[in-house]
Design a protein with these regions (language model features):
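Histidine-centered active-site/metal-ligand motif
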Residues: 1, 39, 43-47, 115, ...
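Metallo-beta-lactamase
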Residues: 44-162
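Conserved beta-strand scaffold positions in the cores of enzyme catalytic domains, especially
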Residues: 7, 19-21, 62, 111, ...
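Generic beta-sheet signal
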Residues: 8-11, 114, 251
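Short, charged, surface-exposed secondary-structure boundary motifs
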Residues: 17-20, 72-73, 234-241
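Short beta-strand micro-motifs in enzyme catalytic cores
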Residues: 36, 46-48, 206
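Cytosolic catalytic domains that perform sulfur/thiol-centered chemistry
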Residues: 91, 104-106, 120-252
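Active-site HxH/HxHxD metal-binding segment of metal-dependent hydrolases
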Residues: 1-39, 53, 58-60, 243
């Protein structure tokens, strides 16, 4: 709303707010460059990869979302309910997407994935944030399976149960969320000790202390939870505080 930019989703998406639902191979022009939509279902049914075509018409990079990571691919077990498919069927669909849309692209294309090491969206992601597609073709286990059956078996093997908040994430992605400005307006106010006591006792607020462990150890509010900002803050909070509507008082 601030910039006037329109939101673009991949084919089959059904958001509850205004957005462009792109078609497979649809091209969007941004100045002198183009973005081509490659529908790559498997992680979810609307999952898409966005191919960057530069001013000279050269295919330069892909923004691969949750389809292709560095060292891994998107887990195919999260959209079973919405897609009315088994995880094996979704994994097979992901294999077909990779083989038909990603593997034929040139080796010098740069891969920009949506997640990196530490994310629960994959099991074998590298810490690097960018790589060539050619190197991924050589080193990514998921791109080196001899057939669909082997791919499905290897991709599903060893997947940990998804964090419990993932289901709510899906609903928020579809339904929309309050603007960041609105969140900051209501959530960035200093609280007095009386305010905190009122929120904890009457609103059921949880106290989340974001300081490092050493500072927390020196003194803390009883019954508070310490998850330091350094490290995997977001995944730990998501794992330990399952209800995304849980009122939280931050100690920083």
């Amino acid at each position: 709303k601030k910039t006037g930019a329109e939101i673009v989703f991949g084919p089959t998406a059904n958001p509850e707010f205004e957005a462009i639902i792109a078609k497979d191979n649809q091209i969007f022009e941004i100045g002198k460059i183009k973005i081509k939509v490659l529908h790559t279902p498997g992680h979810t049914m609307e999952s898409s990869t966005f191919l960057l075509i530069d001013e000279e018409g050269k295919e330069t990079a892909i923004f691969s979302g949750d389809t292709l990571f560095l060292g891994d691919v998107g887990r195919p077990d999260l959209a079973q309910k919405s897609a009315h498919m088994t995880q094996e069927e979704l994994a097979g669909l992901l294999y077909e997407s990779l083989q038909s849309k990603i593997m034929p692209l040139a080796d010098d294309i740069i891969v920009y994935p949506a997640h990196g090491a530490g994310s629960a969206c994959g099991k074998n992601m590298q810490k690097e944030t960018v790589d060539s597609l050619g190197n991924q073709k050589k080193t990514n286990y998921a791109l080196n399976q001899p057939n669909k059956e082997s791919f499905v078996r290897e991709v599903l093997d060893g997947l940990l149960p998804p964090p419990k908040y993932f289901g709510m994430n899906v609903a928020m992605n579809k339904g929309g969320i309050p603007s960041f400005d609105e969140v900051m307006k209501h959530g960035n106010k200093p609280l007095s000790a009386d305010n905190v006591e009122e929120l904890v006792e009457h609103a059921g607020a949880l106290i989340l202390d974001t300081r490092n462990a050493e500072d927390f150890h020196k003194g803390f509010i009883p019954n508070s939870i310490n998850i330091g900002l350094k490290g995997d803050f977001a995944p730990w909070v998501g794992a330990m505080i399952v209800d995304v509507k849980q009122p939280i008082v931050l100690v920083a």
